[in-house]
Structures are given as structure tokens and as C-alpha cells.
A protein has these predicted regions:
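Bacterial N-terminal signal peptides that target proteins for export
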Residues: 1-7, 228
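Bacterial N-terminal signal peptides
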Residues: 5-16
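Glycine-rich His-Gly loop
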Residues: 108-110, 229
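Cap/lid segment of the alpha/beta-hydrolase catalytic domain
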Residues: 110-192, 238
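Alpha/beta-hydrolase fold nucleophile elbow
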Residues: 193-204
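Short glycine-enriched nucleophile-adjacent loop
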Residues: 207-218
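A catalytic-pocket lid/entrance helix-loop region that shapes and gates access to the active site
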Residues: 213, 221-264
Length: 264
């Protein structure tokens, strides 16, 4: 079934690419290092569809072409919460020197916590796609995603974000919209237009995110790929405990009474 789904997706994208190639106005748009000055240092909070206090953009970078990857720009930023005791959403946008008028938002994995889009060899950058993604609004998750741009309250413990309502809402759905809207502003500034086609792609946690944007923000995307989605957020939150229980021998079994005592 998975192979069939991927085949259907590939066929749909190929059909779209073929149709676009026959449109003379669909010629790739080219940028250079000098275009980075158009990125700016901030984005108005009013440009973001869900509530934020501010959006900071860091100094953009230009990555020269290699044998494996064409030249591209890197724009990173932090979306700050309304709650002064909340956690920021750190995000990254990769903008190819030769843009195919397409963009792709990449979903997370596990409990997130690191920016999903990374620099380096990427087949979609080679095809002229803008790539963008975030750490979902808390820091220190699995997989790593480069240097942390901004973090939560001073002295906070690694999992304290889960006790913050805005951070939980960000994980659940708002970070996808906030990251999307910030990326669209950056794309328009750099290329002077927004994508003609925009996609969301994710698996596991990212697959759940894909289902969520399909429900809440369908107008933002021309296509959504949701692979093996974790549809139960409660199960995802319990996953570390369940794994530990399954990996331990019977003598280490934590009974319900012990669990309640630990959590008391």
C-alpha cells in the first residue's frame, strides 16, 4: 500500500511538473547573494495568522554551489510567544538560487524540538524547491537541527514547555501555521512573489501535523503528504514511558499504583 501511495504521489507531481513546463511563464526565478538584503530583520506580528508577540529574523547567509547542491540562501528566525513565559518557535527557510516557484514545509518527528530543515545536500533544493520548517515551539528534541536560535525561560527544565498552554498549542497545530506564514513573507521578499505551489510533507509526528493542517489550514497548501501519522497525541506523549516499560524485565514493571505514587 505504501509503495502504491508513493507511486500515485509521484505520478501526480510528475503530471503537475509536465503541465508547468509547458507554461512559458513558469520559468525558474534566479536570485543572487545581493538579494539577501531584502529579507529584513523582522516580520510584523500582524502577518502571522495565529497570535504571536513578534518575529525576529537573523542575518541571512548565502551557501555557494557544490558538486552536489546548487547555491541557496538561508534565512532563520524566531517567532516569539504571546505568553512572556512561553517558548519561541525557531525556524529555517532554504531558498534556492534558481527557484521553481514551489515550496515545501517539512514536518517534525517524535516530540520535535529541533528545526526540521537542514542545510546540505537535499534533493528538493536540487529541484528548485524552497524548503522550510521549525522546531515546533520548544528546544532540545531528537535529531538535532543546528545551533538553537532562541530558547524558553531562563532556568526552565527541558520538559517544562509541556506545562505551558501556548507551547502545547504550538506543538498541536499553531506552529505549522505560524511557520508557514513567516516563510511566505520571506519568500515574497526574496523572490518578489509567493509560491505557485506549496506542499506539506511529514511522517509520524509530521504525518499528524499533515492531517492537522489539512483540517485547519487547507487553503495554505496545494498538496499534503501524511505518512504513518500519529493520530493520537496522548499516545505520543506517553511513548517514552511505554517504550521503557516494554524494554524492562518483569521485575522492573511499574504498576499503576507505583505510577500514581510517582506522579503524586
Amino acid at each position: 500500500m505504501k509503495r502504491l501511495s508513493l507511486f500515485i504521489i509521484a505520478a501526480m507531481i510528475l503530471a503537475e511538473l509536465t503541465a508547468a513546463s509547458q507554461d512559458a511563464s513558469f520559468k525558474n526565478k534566479v536570485i543572487t547573494k545581493t538579494d539577501l538584503e531584502k529579507a529584513g530583520t523582522s516580520i510584523p506580528a500582524s502577518a502571522i495568522g495565529d497570535p504571536v508577540s513578534s518575529v525576529k529574523l537573523y542575518v541571512p547567509r548565502w551557501v555557494e554551489a557544490t558538486d552536489a547542491t546548487p547555491a541557496y540562501a538561508v534565512v532563520e528566525g524566531s517567532i516569539f510567544p504571546v505568553d512572556p513565559n512561553g517558548w519561541p518557535i525557531n525556524f529555517r527557510v532554504l531558498l534556492p538560487a534558481s527557484w521553481s516557484h514551489r515550496a515545501m514545509q517539512i514536518g517534525g518527528g517524535g516530540m520535535n524540538g529541533s528545526i526540521t530543515v537542514r542545510e546540505g545536500k537535499n534533493p528538493m533544493i536540487n529541484k528548485g524547491f524552497v524548503m522550510y520548517g521549525s522546531d515546533s515551539g520548544h528546544q532540545g528534541g531528537m535529531g538535532g537541527g543546528g545551533t538553537v536560535l532562541a530558547s524558553g525561560p531562563s532556568g526552565a527544565k527541558p520538559d517544562d514547555w509541556a506545562l505551558n498552554e501556548e507551547a502545547i498549542r504550538n506543538l498541536g497545530y499553531m506552529q505549522m501555521k505560524k511557520t508557514h506564514d513567516a516563510a511566505m513573507v520571506i519568500i515574497e521578499r526574496i523572490y518578489n512573489e509567493r509560491p505557485r505551489f506549496n506542499y506539506y510533507v511529514g511522517g509520524s509526528q509530521g504525518g499528524r501535523e499533515g492531517l492537522m493542517v489539512a483540517q485547519r489550514y487547507p487553503a495554505d497548501y496545494d498538496g499534503i503528504i501524511s505518512d504513518v501519522p500519529i493520530v493520537s497525541l496522548s499516545t505520543l506523549m506517553l511513548a517514552p514511558e511505554l517504550i521503557r516499560i516494554q524494554e524492562k524485565p518483569l521485575s522492573s514493571w511499574v504498576t499503576p499504583d507505583k505510577t500514581n505514587a510517582i506522579r503524586a
